[in-house]
A protein has these predicted regions:
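A polyanion-binding, active-site-adjacent surface
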Residues: 1-107, 111, 115, 119-122, ...
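C-terminal capping/extension of enzyme domains
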Residues: 83-97, 120-188
């Protein structure tokens, strides 16, 4: 789970994205990213890397964002929200409800990987922890620096699901051993 959609995504609503994916099941946005459609290729490669290091096939993974809003970057979110006559609290609440009642309900995930992990500001990790997480389960496999990695348990639809949190992969390359260690910290 990333944080929010980029300005490259802004031409398509979430509904349009779901319909497009349904109509073209063999076209992968991640694969298109590998082939350069996103400009940079390292984020898409890293999005493939993590499931593989945990024994999953990246083709079977659902990639989504915590906030259902596109913006040029995280700093411009409030401005974009105001443009749509919404508050950040409304976007956050609606996005988390959509994630719990639609995405998680339909996909029944074994594991969630959040790849923006600030706990002091808005991030995929902070939103998941705030809305679904058990803070008493928060454990770090790498507590600081470039490879900060941690995990906690989240309750979605009455299911406990481990959430593994790594730094934003467009800027930071995750360390597989810390990810696997975080999974083990959650008893998986």
């Amino acid at each position: 789970m990333g944080f929010n959609g980029s300005s490259a995504d802004s031409c398509m609503t979430n509904c349009q994205s779901i319909l497009q994916d349904y109509e073209h099941p063999f076209i992968s946005g991640i694969q298109e990213g590998i082939q350069g459609k996103w400009g940079i290729t390292h984020l898409a490669k890293r999005l493939q890397q993590i499931p593989s290091c945990l024994g999953y096939s990246w083709e079977d993974v659902i990639y989504t964002n915590a906030l259902m809003m596109c913006s040029q970057n995280a700093a411009t979110l409030k401005k974009e929200a105001a443009r749509h006559e919404m508050t950040m609290n409304e976007i956050e609440a609606n996005s988390m409800a959509f994630f719990e009642h639609v995405t998680a309900h339909l996909s029944e995930p074994d594991l969630i990987v959040a790849y923006s992990n600030s706990l002091q500001s808005l991030s995929a990790a902070s939103l998941l922890l705030k809305h679904f997480g058990d803070a008493t389960t928060l454990k770090f496999s790498q507590p600081k620096g470039y490879h900060t990695t941690f995990a906690f348990m989240a309750n979605l639809n009455s299911r406990n699901i481990p959430v593994i949190c790594v730094r934003h992969m467009s800027r930071f390359k995750p360390e597989e051993s810390y990810i696997r260690a975080a999974v083990k910290l959650m008893g998986c």
